[in-house]
Amino acid sequence: MSFPQLGYPQYLSAAGPGAYGGERPGVLAAAAAAAAAASSGRPGAAELGGGAGAAAVTSVLGMYAAAGPYAGAPNYSAFLPYAADLSLFSQMGSQYELKDNPGVHPATFAAHTAPAYYPYGQFQYGDPGRPKNATRESTSTLKAWLNEHRKNPYPTKGEKIMLAIITKMTLTQVSTWFANARRRLKKENKVTWGARSKDQEDGALFGSDTEGDPEKAEDDEEIDLESIDIDKIDEHDGDQSNEDDEDKAEAPHAPAAPSALARDQGSPLAAADVLKPQDSPLGLAKEAPEPGSTRLLSPGAAAGGLQGAPHGKPKIWSLAETATSPDGAPKASPPPPAGHPGAHGPSAGAPLQHPAFLPSHGLYTCHIGKFSNWTNSAFLAQGSLLNMRSFLGVGAPHAAPHGPHLPAPPPPQPPVAIAPGALNGDKASVRSSPTLPERDLVPRPDSPAQQLKSPFQPVRDNSLAPQEGTPRILAALPSA
């Protein structure tokens, strides 16, 4: 029998079944002798080579297909389709089932044949998603486009897609190449053009509204985060200045009525006004019959109606602050005489203060000089040490100013009814706070010295008792 598909017809023509039973060393020796005889060309080598060649081919193709060592193992018997018949025809299974039988070739040759034809996978030229290196031919097209657009080397999205198709490159590779080319041109100082921000350069990749229009693109380049913030602040300041002008125009007329009502009804503003010294021209200016004189003291400012424009006040105005402080910043500096050069405008040398820091503001309810009066009334029940002079009876001069206030009724009308012109500096200092009537409501004994002396004296004696006992103890120690 012959197997022409194996390429060995001359070796298997005269071979018989009895020739397959030789030992492996004898088979190898016979194969070597047959090869030597065929090379020398001696007569009789064909018959010798017939049996030896058949044994050699059988040993090569059927050495791993023998049923003896593999039939007993259950793992390998499943892979051998004719395990029972291979004992008689060991060469048949391997020769007819060359591709399917795992026993045909050893495990070292068990690799699949497909990778030999397509070494990079199922695609003939590799994965198409893998970016390919840019060659000199592909970059020459990009260089030609760059030379034509030296003034504006920013290709649009459509141009990038066209160049990517021509050069067989990806869109990212084209964009990166142009970015590097622009960087090289800037380093070489060969060309200068309007610089673009990175956001706009990335926006050109996905298409922008300013593509192909360099003038519009340059206008957009001037807008960045810092300029946007500054522009917004400038616009906001412009709106604030317009609102400030309106507030300044309405300010002289609006607080006039609340100031008059405050003096009549005894609000905290009235008590704060009493604390001011009355010898300054400001106190006389309150009784002036001209309308708006409480706010505008200079004739030039009264005629103009905008007294706060030249002042260095903050731009943010508070309507509540303007309403609660009718005698605000313009009263901080006394008005110059009529013949003075600064009569028609504010003096440049006079320091301007914010209304919150003026004595007339509602926050300053307690005068600094009368802080002791506040503490005496607040801590009277606790027996504060601040009242020690009144406890000991030494505070006769201190209690004298409080004499007129003891029979005074609780309502706040009596301190408000006093005219500003009738008060002098001493009486104004007595009026310490808008909560002055509340201090009078505190129950005060008629003779604090007589009533509070008796509980205070034992405390003093008790404090002296340990001092007298200490010398006795110290004297007894040396004697012991």
From Swiss-Prot:
Q: Which CDD domains match?
A: homeodomain
Q: What is its main location?
A: nucleus
A Gene Ontology biological process in which this protein takes part is:
negative regulation of transcription by RNA polymerase II
Modification sites for Phosphoserine: S241
User: Which SMART domains does this chain map to?
Assistant: HOX (SM00389), IRO (SM00548)
One Pfam annotation reads Homeobox_KN
> Can you say what this protein is called?
Iroquois-class homeodomain protein IRX-1
